[in-house]
Amino acid sequence: NNFSTNYNHSVDMASIAGSTESQRSIVNNWEFGDELKVNYRLNDNYEFTFHTGGKYYLINSERVGFEKIKASDYNIGLNAQIVLPWELQLTTDITMFARRGYQQTEMNTTDWIWNVQLARTFLKGHLTAKLQGFDLLQQLSNTRYVINSQGRTESWNNSIPRYVMLSLAWKFNINPKKK
């Protein structure tokens, strides 16, 4: 369990619609968060982890036109690591991410993210082959919405939200020569 709290008192200058002068903007930001993980290991071949977390935001200001924000972001999910026949290692994670309480409807979202990895080592552990699938349900968005200390900002991320990748990794040790 991991509880956190944060307070930010932000002072800035803001333009008000219909006015030619800037106005002092004072915004108080409270953030409360908690995370919880429960792990269960049946034996060396089966391990499961339940995880959940969330943050609650309380943002208010006396500034003209500012709408108080009472919003939350939370997630809940399950991880599994299973050893399959032929020494294959299966790792999977499915997590639901949700955002609620925002004035803009595009910020209130529910996204299910499912990732899978299948791995096997060869040559006494020196060579590892992995097949990874990220965001198999195709719900991850390129657009990320963030609320800063003065209001809402929208940032765009240039990324590949979903992919399947095959990789090979060679592990080698180089020992220093003795003098």
Which positions does each model-derived feature cover?
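Exposed, low-structure sequence patches enriched in small/polar residues
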Residues: 1-179
